[in-house]
Amino acid sequence: MKVLSLIFVIFSVLVLFASAKDPVCDQPKAVRRCFAAFPKFYFNSSSGQCEGFIYGGCGGNENNFNTLEECNAKCA
């Protein structure tokens, strides 16, 4: 019975760590009015998906990815 309990605890911890999301993904989309227009992607925590936006080239935060694949790998 102890072995079964230990296996359950280890499995639960592994699932918890596997589902932990990077805090970068909870940052809001940061759109500032600058003079550039770069197509980028961010993770929308409300919809649970990566979405495109136009990055103005200044300011912002780390929830800013060059490709949809990069965003999905980090956050989805």
Curated annotation (Swiss-Prot):
**GO MF entry, a single one:** toxin activity
Q: Which residues form the BPTI/Kunitz inhibitor domain?
A: 25-75
* Cellular component, GO, one term: extracellular space
Q: Kindly list the places in or outside the cell where this protein is found, as annotated in its UniProt entry.
A: Secreted
**Which superkingdom is the protein from?**
Eukaryota
Keywords, comma-separated and alphabetical = Blood coagulation cascade inhibiting toxin, Disulfide bond, Hemostasis impairing toxin, Protease inhibitor, Secreted, Serine protease inhibitor, Signal, Toxin
Signal sequence residues: 1-20
| CDD domains the record matches | Kunitz-type
Q: In which tissues is it expressed?
A: Expressed in salivary glands.
| SS bond list | 25-75, 34-58, 50-71
Looking up PROSITE patterns in the UniProt record yields:
BPTI_KUNITZ_1, BPTI_KUNITZ_2
User: What is the stated purpose of this protein?
Assistant: Potent anticoagulant protein that inhibits the hydrolytic activities of all serine proteases tested (trypsin, thrombin, elastase, and chymotrypsin), with the highest efficacy on thrombin.
Designated name of the protein: Tabkunin 5
